[in-house]
Amino acid sequence: MAAFSGETAVKGIHLINDDGELLPEADINDFLISALAGKGSSDILYRTGVNYHVVGVFGGQSSGKSTLLNSLFQTEFMTMDEAHHRGQTTKGAFMTRAILDAQTHRKEREEGEGADLLKREKPQPLFVLDFEGTDGIERGEDQNFERQLSLFALSVADILIINMWAVDVGRFNAANMNLLRTVFEVNLQLFSHGSYVKEEKPTLLVVLRDFTENDPAPSFETVRKSFDKIWGNIQKPESFTDATIDVVFDLRYRVLPHYKLQRPEFDSAVSEFREWFVSPKNSNFLFSNCSMFRGVPADGMPSYLSNCWNAICSSKDLDIPTQRDMLARHRCADAKHAAIEEFKEVCEEYTKKIQRGDVIPQFTRALEETIERLLKNFSDQTKLYKVSVVHETAEALEEELGDMELHLLKQYAKSIAVTVLAALDGVIGSSVDEAVRWLQNEARSVLLLEGKDNKGDRIDGGGLAQGVLDTAEGLVDNKRCRLFVEEFWKRICLSLQGAFDMLNGCSKSHQAALSSLYGKFATAIMDDQAVREGVAHAAMEGAQHKLRNRFVAMAENAAETVHQVFEQALTSKTDGTVRFFRTTDGLLGAEKQARQAGLVLLGCLLYYRLKLVPVEVDAGEVEGEGTTRALQRLVRDRCRFQVRDNRTEKNFFLHFTNISDVPRYPLDAPTSVVDSGDTTADTVNADNVLLSHNALQCAFHLYKQKADFTLQMQLRNIESGKQSLPPWVLPVMLLLGWNELYYLLTSPILLIAIIVIAVLFFKTFLKSQLEVLEEKCPVWLVVSVKALLQQAQALQNAYAPTEAVRGGGGGAQFRDPTQATSVSGASAGVSSESSSAASPRRRVCRESRDKGED
């Protein structure tokens, strides 16, 4: 019989040649397509599914197996020509599709009535396998190939026909009982596997040829006794010791008249016999029990045949359920790969749009619809395979598609987060600047315990440097410094979190602000919660990265950063106005507070204490109706800013002794290279340590030099600005001008005029003298004088209000016209924007306290 070619469809294929080689899978696939629908219908195998059957035939050589199949199924298997020779005709195994008798179906259609006629379906495709005959001289006593074919037939065929001559019933060799013994053994081998389904047993159809008796029952009984005897003599597993042959086979019997002597009767019997295969209404219909079939989808048959034959030829233990499991995994893997490749193409198109900066409306919805379509296609392609394998692969496919979707959404979110970060750049910078300004003002209030009495020291121009060193002996309140560092980072954390909280909000009050943050993407993503979640996460990561880089830059230039704070604390008041010193005592008193403020900021630069931690979300928010798989994962990844506070980090601070010595570095703290993000880990993350021990020492000494130089310049300004009269001038003026002074004191009108003139023309001088009074006099006197001046100012506003008071106090207050340098990554300075002015009483109390501490 001619083999099947990939280009030309003939009536059958030589499935296994006489050398034991199976036809390639591609050729088997082409044959199946051609046999089912002809060329150009590549999806016919998928549409066929498991709706087909396979029938195989076994028997002795030259026993008429091919003749039986040709008569029964109208096939064209090659038959023996007795006129020329008797010998082997079928070598290996041939396969073709049966041509069912049109007369049978026409008869059924004629018997059908009404709706039954319309509902009647075409018969399912039937493939026929013609195996090489046994007991041939060509193979001799070699039964290995015979056993391989038997095992292959039982693993493929739903029904196995045993072709036997009626006259050989009751014989052993002539009836080919060796073949039956082989069939029983290999089928028992298949059934011995624990994964084998007991109901899935093949049908063994015994056909007695050339039967001339009237009653076939005695012959059937004899055949059954022969089967039972063979079954009893074979070695069985323990679980089948007491089992009968019916456990592993569904035995059926049929007799046919003599092919030559009773040809009309033979043809009639064959026609009736055919109904067993094609007519569901027939009481002997062979395909009524679906659990008996192999259940291999048509599109997986080539792979299944190849796997089974390879396992048989390699002498492996053939397990049909395992083979079906392997086939299911193979087909599911192919379908999964096709779905992933298709989704990759979709992702590539979207990636190009993202790189171009295009706005993609309803992005998540489009991706979800694509994934749902691919999952449905996968389900349709694999629904006929093993359910557990399909379910497992479908879950893996959904997870992989979800990962790809999430990656693409994050990529899109990052492109939008660039716009959001640009809009929030000022917020990020101001959070640090505000924290530094707060620290600068509050650190001045840290109590210093004097370690040396320097009240009697006088600093002249020549002994300036030594005087500065002598005053820098204050002991630092270490506990309060640590609290300031903690509060510094908490303020930054709260400021940033407050700015980023609205990115996760969807209230109407936030929509206007969000629109300005999202820019051109606002309209497209306001209704896309998954993208908004991704943008919020990406923006927070970007802010964390940007903020950390800024502190790294500040730490790299720590001396200049700390010196800027020292300089601003020294030359400005707590309300932001400029402070001018008239005396060296006032300057040296403020210098200790300013130096303390710089040291506390240095403690803040030791360790970067912010991190992103997951946020617990409500189950309803994650699993609510309409929630996409991408949104569920993004919501679970929602995070917030938090100050690092594990046990080791709570103690990882600089220890200050006094303002003139290098702070003690916490060298004993355990560190770890990998940041686990676990707040319970008792380690310090080495990547977040901004200042090493050596860097701290270098920064402190350089800062001290800069601070000393700044102090010297301020002292020189004070010394150069001193304008004082000789001590003898005032007594002489009082003595010589006593008469004029007496006349002035006794004339109220003239006295009032002189006071008004002095206030108007000597206001600046009087203020400077008041500042000198504040710096040199005791605190009780300063407070009393300022209280008196405040009462006078209140009386003036009550009885002679100025234009500013009449206008509601809208007059401009004094501020330093020069802008101070801000703390940035480049200069590591501190921005000094003017804060709201404190009340006069509060300012007096604060300055008085400073003087008292001095």
UniProtKB/Swiss-Prot annotation:
> What domain of life does the native source organism fall in?
Eukaryota
The annotated regions of Basic and acidic residues compositional bias extend over: 845-854
Any single Gene Ontology cellular-component annotation? endoplasmic reticulum
Q: What is its EC number?
A: 3.6.5.-
For side Lumenal, which residue ranges? 746-748
Give the membrane topology, semicolon-separated if more than one.
Multi-pass membrane protein
- Domain annotation GB1/RHD3-type G: ranges: 49-291
Region annotated Disordered sits at: 808-854
Keywords from the UniProt entry: Coiled coil, Endoplasmic reticulum, GTP-binding, Hydrolase, Membrane, Nucleotide-binding, Transmembrane, Transmembrane helix
What CDD domains does the database record attribute to this sequence?
Answer: GBP (cd01851)
Q: Where are the transmembrane segments?
A: 725-745, 749-769
Coiled coil (residue ranges):
336-386
Residue numbers binding GTP: 59-66
Chain intervals with Low complexity compositional bias: 822-839
Parts of the chain on the Cytoplasmic side: 1-724, 770-854
Does the keyword field hold GTP-binding?
yes
Location (main, coarse): endoplasmic reticulum
InterPro entries given in the database record:
G_GB1_RHD3_dom, P-loop_NTPase, RHD3/Sey1, Sey1/RHD3-like_3HB
GO BP term, example: endoplasmic reticulum membrane fusion
Localization (cell): Endoplasmic reticulum membrane
MF terms in GO? GTP binding; GTPase activity
Role, per record: Probable GTP-binding protein that may be involved in cell development.
Family note: Belongs to the TRAFAC class dynamin-like GTPase superfamily. GB1/RHD3 GTPase family. RHD3 subfamily.
The protein's name: Protein SEY1 homolog
